[in-house]
Amino acid sequence: MKSIVFVALFGLALLAVACSASEDAHKELLKEVVRAMVVDKTDAVQAEERECRWYLGGCSQDGDCCKHLQCHSNYEWCIWDGTFSK
């Protein structure tokens, strides 16, 4: 009888250790996923800042617009600058 109780308690202790190790691994995985999401958002913001604005895209200066476009002074959107080239 004592040995059965001892084995049952020992089994429960092993199960608790295994669950706690699994929980730690789960927490680490969650941290990695969150880090990856934050890095991806940071990269996306940087990419948006470098891209030019297309036709009728909002702008504040000519440098914001793509090639052959200029920033319209009244409406602040990119319009064609009247040039042709390849």
Swiss-Prot record:
Pfam families: Toxin_12 (PF07740). GO terms for cellular component: extracellular region. Expressed by the venom gland. Residues 22-50 form a propeptide. It comes from the Eukaryota. GO terms for molecular function: ion channel inhibitor activity; toxin activity. Belongs to the neurotoxin 10 (Hwtx-1) family. 17 (Hntx-9) subfamily. The presence of a 'disulfide through disulfide knot' structurally defines this protein as a knottin. Ion channel inhibitor. This is Omega-theraphotoxin-Hhn1f 3. The lineage of its organism: Eukaryota, Metazoa, Ecdysozoa, Arthropoda, Chelicerata.
